[in-house]
Amino acid sequence: MAADPTTDAALGDLRELLAANDLALLDLVNRRLDLVEKIKQRKSELGVSFVDPEREAWLFDYLRGANTGPLSDDGLRELLTTVLDLTKRELAGN
């Protein structure tokens, strides 16, 4: 007979930890948006383009060097692409 996942204490504890990590991730994304908004404003004042493909490439290389796994390089690229695309969309009207 299979265990009931709704009453398994260890599973519940792991889900609570995951939920805490998800909240931390949400906070980090919101903080990132605040910082990028400031960068966008400063770049506008300097007459510099908001999107910088060279900086995005540098960021991927930097994060790839810092990544200790288990996230793969392909997974990192997908995550970063998603975050950058989301950031650009969120700040498009600002």
Residue ranges, per PLM feature:
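Domain-level signature for soluble enzymes in the chorismate/prephenate branch of the shikimate pathway
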Residues: 1-94
